[in-house]
From Swiss-Prot:
GO biological process: L-histidine biosynthetic process; L-tryptophan biosynthetic process
Coiled-coil segments: none
Species this chain originates from: Nocardioides sp. (strain ATCC BAA-499 / JS614)
Annotated Gene Ontology cellular component terms: cytoplasm
InterPro entries with a match to the protein in the record: Aldolase_TIM, His_biosynth, HisA/PriA_Actinobacteria, Isoase_HisA-like, Isoase_HisA-like_bact, RibuloseP-bd_barrel
A GO molecular-function annotation: phosphoribosylanthranilate isomerase activity
NCBIfam families: hisA-trpF
Name the UniProt record assigns to this protein: 1-(5-phosphoribosyl)-5-[(5-phosphoribosylamino)methylideneamino] imidazole-4-carboxamide isomerase
Top-rank EC class of the record's enzyme: isomerase
Active site (record annotation): D12 (proton acceptor), D131 (proton donor)
Keywords annotated in UniProt: Amino-acid biosynthesis, Cytoplasm, Histidine biosynthesis, Isomerase
Cell compartments where the protein resides: Cytoplasm
Family: Belongs to the HisA/HisF family.
Name of the gene this protein is made from: hisA
Length: 244
């Protein structure tokens, strides 16, 4: 386990643009320009990770694969790639970009046998995205229910999943603060590290997440708050890293 909270600024892409959605709803996006420039801006501000999402692939309406590869190639920092990774071909393409790890979401729910094999073959280059409403998982770009969170977590733990990215869908993009109780509950149910996503709005939210590092929260994804200027990445990193 890490002894500090890793911050992962998000770069979410749709139709070649950097966007942020409200509660993951297609059509709710606010646009923030060129995703390559956004990723470079976060790197220059001191980020050691970028959370890179292809929303078109997640919604099954196309892909931004070449653009994702361009972004990974332009960066010197580590990239966690997400969105539409559901079969051997899309997984191979994602890994071939040189990203450090991929997030698998829907496929972990709809194709458990494939997911088991991928976890066994790729180890900590694979994280499982658990997108949650209450106790229920959301799939297919958060448009379909995907079963019980804790039953799925137990199955994935037994298969050796190295890491979970846990998103409270109702919090995502809403600037209302993270769901700390959900994160505590997930950390209590698994020994694997957890990356928190959804709701980070203020530096106080980051401080609250830092308090969960000892129970298993390894990192936090920040998106809308950064793009809307609620705090700067430099200030957030100074907070999480302390004297590091």
């Amino acid at each position: 386990m890490s002894d500090y909270l890793e911050l992962l600024p998000a770069v979410d892409i749709t139709e070649g643009r950097a966007v942020q959605l409200a509660q993951g709803v297609a059509g709710s996006e606010r646009t923030y320009g060129d995703p390559v420039a956004a990723a470079m801006r976060w790197q220059e501000a001191g980020a050691e990770w970028i959370h890179l999402v292809d929303l078109d692939a997640a919604f099954g309406r196309g892909s931004n694969r070449e653009l994702q590869a361009e972004i990974v190639g332009a960066l010197d920092v580590q990239v966690e790639m997400s969105g539409g990774i559901r079969d051997d071909e899309s997984l191979a393409a994602a890994l071939a970009t040189g990203c450090r790890r991929v997030n698998i979401g829907t496929a972990a729910l709809e194709q458990p046998e494939w997911c088991r094999r991928v976890i066994a073959e790729h180890g900590d280059r694979v994280a499982i995205g658990l997108d949650v409403r209450g106790r229920t998982l959301a799939a297919r770009g958060w448009t379909k229910d995907g079963g019980d969170l804790y039953e799925t977590l137990a199955r994935l733990d037994a298969e050796g999943c190295a890491r979970y990215v846990v998103t409270d869908v109702n919090k995502d993009g809403m600037l209302q603060g993270p769901n700390l109780q959900l994160l505590r509950d997930v950390c209590a149910a698994t020994s694997a590290p957890v990356v928190a996503s959804g709701g980070v709005t203020t530096l106080a939210d980051i401080e609250a997440l830092m308090e969960l590092v000892p129970v298993g929260v390894e990192g936090a994804i920040a998106g809308t708050a950064l793009y809307e200027g609620r705090f700067t990445l430099e200030d957030a990193l100074a907070l999480t890293r302390g004297g590091r």
